[in-house]
């Protein structure tokens, strides 16, 4: 097992905050979105990791953005992430690869391994795939030496730049289905489950807060990561499930989220109220 990295000494050490465990952590994970809505390259990430790297557990390429980038640039990002103990995820691009057949999927996984990716997210927001086939993909990813991270949600057509009206027309699944899927994926060896925000807190008239509540009640928080790339959404998760809930956010939001986790700043409903209790390891 990899030894936990020591948290760097922060400024103003005499001020008490909710201290974070060293990496690798099992709770309070933060995954940041990398290249997609904006250019995120090595030089930008050097600044981000120099200041906030201790709080980032993984970086996710979105929308298959790595397929547009020079291989050298992808490798530089991956290597820089690893230097700062940050894992690298493919994002859910495999569903785009799946429509090209099994050979393309195997080549994709091999290439991800070669480039140094750690996590392959397995999404099916736009396609319909049998659960048993999904389980085979998890097994294939694991046998390649990578971590499988299936994405589960209740919204048909989720995962892209789809309008709220289009998503509403597509309809939603029963949350019981999502819970059953997540349990089967974990039993098959999935590292953690990504919970898609669309249909729950994104592109909806009313937040479906009962869905994450049921998922957490059935599975717990440690094996779930919630998409929350909106300040109101990640503040809601922190308020309701505490500082150690696992969240996916945009790279631009890392400081704002960590201020909430640390209990040093926040909105009126959270200011000074986020508290943790950790046994001393000294």
Regions found by a protein language model. Give the residues of each.
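C-terminal alpha-helical cap/extension of soluble enzyme domains
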Residues: 5-22, 214-282
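Active-site mouth loops of central-metabolism enzymes
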Residues: 25-44, 62-67, 89-104, 127, ...
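Hydrophobic faces of well-ordered beta-strands that scaffold small-molecule active sites
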Residues: 27-35, 56-61, 88-92, 120-122, ...
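Generic structural signal for hydrophobic
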Residues: 48-52, 81, 111-112, 141, ...
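Conserved N-terminal beta1-alpha1 strand-loop-helix module at the mouth
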Residues: 2-62, 66-76
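Active-site rim beta-loop-alpha module in soluble metabolic enzymes
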Residues: 186-208
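Active-site-adjacent beta->alpha loops and helix N-cap segments on the catalytic face
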Residues: 18-19, 41-43, 67-80, 97-106, ...
């Amino acid at each position: 097992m990899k030894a936990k990295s020591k948290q760097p000494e922060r400024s103003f050490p005499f001020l008490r905050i909710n201290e974070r465990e060293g990496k690798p952590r099992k709770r309070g994970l933060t995954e940041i979105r990398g290249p997609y809505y904006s250019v995120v390259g090595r030089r930008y990430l050097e600044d981000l990791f120099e200041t906030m790297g201790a709080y980032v557990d993984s970086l996710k390429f979105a929308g298959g953005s790595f397929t547009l980038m020079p291989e050298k640039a992808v490798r530089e990002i991956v290597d820089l992430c690893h230097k700062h103990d940050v894992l690298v995820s493919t994002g859910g691009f495999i569903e785009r690869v799946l429509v090209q057949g099994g050979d393309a999927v195997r080549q994709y996984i091999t290439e991800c391994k070669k480039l140094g990716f750690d996590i392959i997210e397995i999404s099916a927001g736009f396609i319909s795939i049998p659960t048993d086939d999904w389980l085979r993909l998890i097994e294939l990813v694991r046998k390649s030496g990578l971590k499988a991270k299936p994405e589960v949600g209740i919204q048909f057509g989720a995962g892209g730049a789809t309008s709220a009206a289009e998503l509403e027309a597509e309809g939603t699944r029963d949350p019981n289905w999502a819970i059953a899927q997540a349990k089967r994926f974990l039993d098959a060896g999935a590292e953690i489950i990504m919970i898609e925000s669309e249909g729950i807190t994104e592109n909806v008239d009313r937040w479906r807060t009962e869905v994450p509540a049921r998922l957490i009640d059935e599975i717990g928080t440690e094996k779930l990561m919630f998409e929350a790339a909106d300040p109101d959404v990640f503040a809601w998760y922190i308020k309701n499930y505490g500082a150690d809930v696992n969240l996916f956010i945009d790279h631009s939001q890392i400081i704002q989220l960590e201020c909430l986790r640390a209990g040093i700043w926040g909105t009126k409903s959270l200011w000074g109220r986020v508290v943790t209790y950790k046994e001393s390891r000294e």
